[in-house]
A protein has these predicted regions:
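Catalytic cores of enzyme domains
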Residues: 25-30, 34-55, 59-187
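TRNA-binding/sensing appendages of the translation machinery
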Residues: 2-30
Length: 187
């Protein structure tokens, strides 16, 4: 739990049970104040990511880097979830991450309904819920489920994951195992 945690031990145990019942075993409670937000991550989105301007939950359709940083500082408790997989082709990754992201959206909803009105999820990959993204927030077909990825919120996932003791490396081939991370902001 976060350094100034608002969540009691009983609440934490109740949420742990919920996560585990839904099949999530590889996660840690974290202090969201320690999530590393960096301008270089946004630059990688703008100059290097094929989703830029084509996804309603990716830049330029997300808050500025300073607004992202302020967002994380409003929370005391969060959870980082780790997902690992090796795939042969980029399409395989997107198919897998879409399934995972849909399940994660349901988890966020369940946490919200459990009384955590501030629950907010960052998907483990770009949204990808719809086959045909509108590319704008206004035109989003799934506004209650669509969420940004940590990278689109300028999170340095590499440094943040390592800081919390998780493995992550740059892959040089799609067939190498990847570690993807989702963040559930709770309170």
């Amino acid at each position: 739990m976060g350094a100034k945690s608002d969540i009691t031990e009983n609440e934490c145990q109740r949420l742990d049970r919920m996560f585990q019942e839904k099949g999530y075993a590889d996660y840690k409670w974290i202090d969201p104040q320690k999530i590393i937000v960096s301008q270089w991550v946004r630059m990688k989105c703008i100059f290097g990511c094929g989703e830029y301007g084509k996804n309603a939950c990716c830049p330029p359709n997300v808050p500025s880097v300073s607004e992202c940083e302020r967002f994380f500082h409003e929370y005391q408790d969060a959870v980082i979830f780790r997902f690992e997989k090796a795939v042969d082709k980029p399409e395989d990754r997107h198919r897998w991450s879409k399934k995972v992201n849909i399940k994660l959206a349901k988890l966020e909803r369940d946490v919200f309904l459990a009384g955590y009105e501030r629950a907010f999820l960052l998907f483990m990959d770009s949204c990808g819920i719809c086959a045909d993204c509108s590319a704008t927030r206004e035109g989003c077909k799934e506004p209650t489920s669509a969420r940004p990825s940590p990278e689109s919120m300028a999170v340095d996932v590499y440094s943040t994951a390592r800081q919390f003791g998780f493995p992550i490396e740059v892959r040089t081939e799609y067939s190498q195992e990847m570690n993807r991370y989702a963040f559930l902001m709770i309170r």
